[in-house]
Amino acid sequence: MESRYNPTEIEPKWQASWAKQGLDATPEDTSKPKFYALSMFPYPSGSLHVGHTRNYVITDVIARLKRMQGYRVLQPMGWDAFGLPAENAAIARGIHPAEWTYANMAQMKKQLEPLGLSIDWSREIATCSPDYYRWTQWIFLQFLDMGLAYQKEAAVNWDPVDQTVLANEQVDNEGRSWRSGAKVERKLLRQWFLKITDYAEELLTDLDKLTGWPERVKTMQANWIGKSVGAYLEFPIVGMDEKVAVFTTRPDTVYGVTYVVLAPEHPLTPQVTSKAQKKAVDKFIEAVGAESEMDRTAEDKPKKGIPTGGKAINPFTGEEIPIWIADYVLYEYGTGAVMGVPAHDTRDFVFAQQNKLPIQTVIVPEGGDAETPLEAAYTEPGLMVNSGEFDGKVSTEGKQAIIAKAETKGWGKARVQYRLRDWLISRQRYWGVPIPVIHCPNCGAVPVPEADLPVELPEDVEFSAQGGSPLAKLESWVNVACPNCGADAKRETDTMDTFIDSSWYFLRYPDAKNDKAVFDSAKTNDWLPVDQYVGGIEHAILHLLYSRFFTKVMRDRKLLNFDEPFKKLLTQGMVQALTYKNPETGQYIAPINVDADDPKDPETGAPLEAFYEKMSKSKYNGVPPEEVTNKYGADTARLFTLFKAPPEKDLEWEGADVEGQFRFLNRVWRLVSEHAAQAKGKKAKVNKAKLSKTEKELRRSIHIAIKETSEDLDGDYQFNTAVSELMKLSNALSDSKEKASPVYAEGVETLLLLLTPFAPHISEELWENLGHSESILGQTWPQVDEEALVADEITLVIQIMGKTRGTIQVPAGSSREDLEQLARESEVAQRYIAGKEVKKVIVVPGKLVNFVVPK
């Protein structure tokens, strides 16, 4: 046996052995309960840092634990391989996106394998493979057949750097692209959409089923879906047969409407605009058209508007009110128009003051005054005033009364509205899934026949930074015959949003190599839903919402028999590293070029800011996993990742802390190696009836470790405290004087079994050194002996006047009377109560005895 711990020797040895034995393969035995453990698959960007690997290690610990607990486990891996970076690399480096992508996949797989992840690589998928995207296209055709995919002209978010369209969810709060960081522009294009709004209510209500999800994620999704209950009201336009339709959650304020606002893009805008205002309105529309949606709706940005010269009639008051257009109203949202109630809406109040529009109070707090000019909008419920027949009604009741009158008079009706918009999936780039549609002058948009799938990406494409779809420029690929009538037709040249690929990949893994169907429903229904999903909080809305949507659609297509894809979700925190930045230039400096004791810019000598920030290439602070595994081994890297912080919290990467985990594993190595040398393979059964006091204490420590570790790993996965329990058990064994006892042998084996999910290589090596011929990976998770947890003695705290003065050992299970007697007779108590009158004794069984004596 190796006399010292040498991870660089034992880890490759056991990884090769496990691969040869096929221990990571997914079992076909359906007699065991299933457990599907899944990490969000990565985009193959080129290289990994330990921030990326944290979630794979977390998932692997769970997968290994569940195998030991008797489950058949599926833990697959794949690549979210389409996307703009590959195409941009093709432009910059003159290589094909496929070549760049597959090289990155190979590099990242090479980085992952030394970590000892128990991944079933036989199920590996890549979304850029025609074998996979054939079925992505097939799914799109199902959406098309169900009326859930459609085309329409739309004002879209245009990324001027990546030269493509972005979904609303891909634009941040500052109006910038989620990927390139470019300021997003508005552009009118004919686009493909998926009708996610058809599932808005179910996506919202089914959040209640997700008891294993963080509340934060569910709240983010609920807010994104944004259900509003209110009224649809119509305001007739003066001199026209048309009406301005609005949605409001405050129909009780309708008597306070003093203007209505249209989106500049609203089709009624040119109709209601007067000749006198046309020039100014056209100029305003042109200026607004250059702004992104986020710019237009930002709360901290002043709202701009202009009167059209048109008038509408408030049907409840009969009064004429002006029609304006404003930048903050978007045609894609709601009806594309809003009613202005400045007295009771903060934004309307500011807009009305800015543009000298009337402010009419129609809701007041109880005892309030409707005549006093408002200094700010009153937005709370109250009593209706200046509201005709509804005066004096509580506003909550008034809402229903107003809706009832609107329905009776034909002015409107009750309505539920959602913030969620249909999902725009068109992208004007090459490296994505071609949309399987052919445009025929006779037949319109014709789906590609299923027999002709996949519509493969052509390889002879020229890549340019000039924008537009590269596919559209390749006539040999674009020009085809219509599948219906045979006429000359053209392929759809847009590709799909890459979030389509990741919206169903988890359904493919149970049947990853099926070339006859998207998957065998029996296999997928057996393994799904995913029991534990692990990934970043940044995917709370996009990926997780879209995956839920796809699952529900495919259920309705009779392909699945479940409603939700992921039972439990763990959103791991970020891994942060020491980061250096020049505050004058804003440039980040690689730590390797900085003296940590005196951080200065190596070129200018300027002092640098030093702080912890999320690992990323742009900040030069990423630590590649091999930097750790080459020096300390995978088990140390895994333990540090798990021990430093709870999984949902951010983790600060510190080299000294990594060293601490390496020292712990060295202690385990020495402890087990010394025992193996003494035991020489001999086995001795623990005789619980004949244990000495110290053996009982040691056995209690062993079973406390089993209990605490099991509880830490059951539910919330508190890996950090579980590792702490292993350290406590290691210390108890090291301190024990019973090293020849069968109890000590039980403790050593228990330590290795509990350590296995965290540090499988060292556990396997030491298990073999103890004389075992079968892999520790196939052993059963230790079970708690409840009897062992019961102590013969407990520690009793002695207090005098509420102040702790010492402790004594007393028999467990002692009565209150016995505890008081033992405490009175103890040396600790006698020092304070001897010769004094004890006025009162407070006994807390199992914890303390407190004596109250005169001062």
Swiss-Prot record:
GO terms for molecular function: aminoacyl-tRNA deacylase activity; ATP binding; leucine-tRNA ligase activity. It is found in: Cytoplasm. GO terms for biological process: leucyl-tRNA aminoacylation. One of its GO terms (cellular component) is cytosol. Pfam families: Anticodon_1, tRNA-synt_1, tRNA-synt_1_2, tRNA-synt_1g. It catalyses: tRNA(Leu) + L-leucine + ATP = L-leucyl-tRNA(Leu) + AMP + diphosphate. ATP binds at residue 617. Residues 292-311 are annotated as: Disordered. Its EC number is 6.1.1.4. InterPro entries: aa-tRNA-synth_I_CS, aa-tRNA-synth_Ia, Leu-tRNA-ligase, Leu_tRNA-synth_edit, M/V/L/I-tRNA-synth_anticd-bd, Methionyl/Leucyl_tRNA_Synth, Rossmann-like_a/b/a_fold, tRNAsynth_Ia_anticodon-bd. A motif ('KMSKS' region) lies at residues 614-618. The keyword Transferase does not apply. Keywords: Aminoacyl-tRNA synthetase, ATP-binding, Cytoplasm, Ligase, Nucleotide-binding, Protein biosynthesis. Residues 293-303 have a biased composition (Basic and acidic residues). A motif ('HIGH' region) lies at residues 42-52. Belongs to the class-I aminoacyl-tRNA synthetase family. This is Leucine--tRNA ligase. It comes from Acaryochloris marina (strain MBIC 11017).
